[in-house]
Each structure stands twice: as structure tokens, then as C-alpha cells.
Amino acid sequence: MTSILTNNSAMAALSTLRSISSSMEDTQSRISSGLRVGSASDNAAYWSIATTMRSDNQALSAVQDALGLGAAKVDTAYSGMESAIEVVKEIKAKLVAATEDGVDKAKIQEEITQLKDQLTSIADAASFSGENWLQADLSGGAVTKSVVGSFVRDGSGSVAVKKVDYSLNANSVLFDTVGDTGILDKVYNVSQASVTLTVNTNGVESQHTVAAYSLESLTEAGAEFQGNYALQGGNSYVKVENVWVRAETAATGATGQEIAATTTAAGTITADSWVVDVGNAPAANVSAGQSVANINIVGMGAAALDALISGVDAALTDMTSAAASLGSISSRIDLQSEFVNKLSDSIESGVGRLVDADMNEESTRLKALQTQQQLAIQALSIANSDSQNVLSLFR
């Protein structure tokens, strides 16, 4: 039926044209933005995941920047420590030279003074962005320095920033800015070699080799030994598990220390039940007397020089250990930085697979829609001409 009030063919053609135009708009939007899922209305689940992961990727970018800053701090500290080690090696060599008979120790001291000033200069200069890891205030104990290492999200959705920690303590900083507990401003005590103790128990003597102890391992005054008391054959016995002999600090080894203790049936200490007698102090410590930072060898004797050389060598050991720790952290930061780069690329790639548009597919679809649009316009034109055909009947 032909009607001049309702043109069903034109309405159908117009509806088709509108649908094609809407599809073209969507396709053009995907082509211009490059996104298949550009908003939550396109795909709520994928859009939500992509938005969250993009946010995490931005956080990882900040982590990457922080790792670069941390690497610079560590590298600066390592370079300073490495330079300081070379200077302390020179000081040690000067001290060894000073042990030679007839040398002018005052002249050697002048050279050592310049080297000490160089150590101070190195420690002061080893700073990056206001952070100095070669000197610190240790009056309140160790100071922890941190470098941002990663940004993580667990299965429950909780996020956290992980850090790489480095402790500034008496064995890792060159100078204590307030006290004297840094590697270069503390006095080292050097343990003597092990000695042999002669133990006399009820008249029977036996020898026992006792290794020297470092200062830190000595038991404080007032400590007690542990053991069991027993009676057998009319004699008193004490089974000793731990005996500590107090070590004296002296320029040379102290002698003549002894421990004497006895037991009776009642457990009272009387006399001569057992005796530990030593010819030399079993755990004596020779004090270097000076730190690396305040060395003065003018007028120093041979024994004191030997102790000082041992003290400087102990400082070198601590510095080498600290440099190794810094090197390990530097290596870890490099590995973490490489990992964060790869992780960021993986996240970006994963998000792309979720929301990116396939440009080949979209361009092909656009060509097809343009053809459909032209045909729909032609169909609408034909449908609109039906009313003109009706008018021709009345001519």
C-alpha cells in the first residue's frame, strides 16, 4: 500500500542509515584513540583492569626514578669508600716504613697528616642530594638508609612499597660525626695470640690451649662460671663449663694473671681444690691507642707501632667489608632496575592486549561501513521518491 502520510520504506532506510552512522562513529573513535575499550561503557571489566594496571605502571615509573636516585647515592658512597681504602693503604705503608731503625718519624708523620686530611675530605665530599653514607651521627645507634625498590600489589588488592635497606653503623661509616665509633675514629684493640693454660686439679696438672678473645667477646665483670659440684672418694670436684679470664688492655701483653677457686663438701670456696695458673694473659688485648684519624707516631716505640699497624689493618678490613656491602647493594639496585623496566613493559603489553584496537581490522570495517552508508543514502533517496511517484498519478 502506498501512503502519503507514512513512508515505511524511507523509515526503514533511515533506521539503517542511523545504525551505520553510529557504527562509523564508534569505528572512527577507535581509530583516532587506538583503543578498543576506551571507556567503561565499552567493556566495564577490561576497562577496570586496564585503569588499575595503568595506575600501577605509573607507580613503577616513579620506582624506576627512585632506583636511579638510589643507585647514584650508593655509587657515590662506594667511590668514596674505594678512594678511602687506597688512602688507608698508604697510611699503613707509611707506618711499616716507620718501623725501620733510624727513620725520621716526624717526616713520616707529616705525610700521614696529609693522608688523614685527605680521608676527611673524601668523607665530606661523598654526598649526593644531601645524603652522605660515609659519615653519620651514631650517638643514637645505627642509622638505616633506604632506597625504594619496588611497588607491589598482592592478591587481595593491597599495595606496598618495598625498600632496600643499608645500615650506617660502626662497621660501615668512616666517621661518627658526634662520637668516635666510626671506622676511622675508633681505637682498635688487637688480641694477642693464643696461650697455653696449665690447669692443676687436685695435684694433677694438664695443659689446655686457649685462643685469645676479641674485646667484644669478653664477659663483663661480675659474671659467673657455670658447672656442677660433686663429691667422690672424699674429694671435692667442680665440673666447669665456662671460665672467663679478665683481659687487661696494655701497650704490651700483661702477665701473671691467675684464677684460683676451691670447693668443699658444703660448696664453700676454701683453698687449693683447683687452680688455673697462666704464664701470660690468655685473653690480653694490645690497644692500638690511637684511631686512624688521630695517628701520631712521633716518639712511638716499636711495640706501639706494631699495635698501631694492626689497628690500621683492622680498619682496612672493616672498610673492605663496607665497600663489599655497598657493591652488593649497587648490583641489587641494577638488577631491580632492569626488572622494573621489564615488568613495566609487560604490564603495558598486557593492558594493550585488553584494550588496544586492531587498526587493520578497524580500517577494513570503516571501508565497509562507508560503502554501507553510501548504499543506505541511496536507498533512502529511492524511498523518498515514492511520494513523487504518487503525485504523478494525479497529473
From Swiss-Prot:
One of its GO terms (cellular component) is extracellular region. Keywords: Bacterial flagellum, Secreted. InterPro entries: Flagellin, Flagellin_C, Flagellin_N. It is found in: Secreted; Bacterial flagellum. GO terms for molecular function: structural molecule activity. The keyword Secreted applies. Pfam families: Flagellin_C, Flagellin_N. Its main location: secreted. Flagellin is the subunit protein which polymerizes to form the filaments of bacterial flagella. Homomer of FlaA is able to form a functional filament. Belongs to the bacterial flagellin family. This is Flagellin A. It comes from Rhizobium meliloti (Ensifer meliloti). The lineage of its organism: Bacteria, Pseudomonadati, Pseudomonadota, Alphaproteobacteria, Hyphomicrobiales.
